[in-house]
């Protein structure tokens, strides 16, 4: 498995996204973020489904093969603009998850 250097050691790519989420999100939003990531790509940063790419299956060719942090912040921006932010100024991943569930996509 490919690893990404972080600090003095190296970790698996999905751990990079998990670490970013852990530092940037409240526990509730991190939980919803992680459910979305697993459902969308099974935590596979190279996942492809038609014209959708990466952890979050975004419809942007820029995500194809993009580094973990780029994918994370791309989705951060997408969710913030589409579903709003919480009172802690973080993307509302739980609102995004609810939308996916209502549509039957989760």
Where in the sequence are the language-model features?
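N-terminal prepro-regions of secreted/extracellular proteins
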Residues: 1-11
């Amino acid at each position: 498995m490919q690893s990404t250097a972080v600090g003095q050691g190296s970790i698996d790519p999905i751990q990079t996204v998990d670490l970013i989420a852990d530092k940037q999100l409240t526990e509730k939003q991190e939980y919803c973020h992680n459910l979305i990531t697993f459902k969308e790509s099974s935590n596979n940063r190279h996942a492809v489904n038609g014209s959708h790419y990466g952890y979050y299956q975004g419809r942007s060719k820029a995500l194809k093969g993009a580094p973990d942090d780029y994918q994370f912040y791309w989705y951060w921006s997408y969710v913030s603009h589409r579903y709003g932010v919480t009172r802690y100024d973080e993307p509302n991943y739980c609102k995004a998850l609810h939308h996916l569930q209502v549509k039957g996509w989760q």
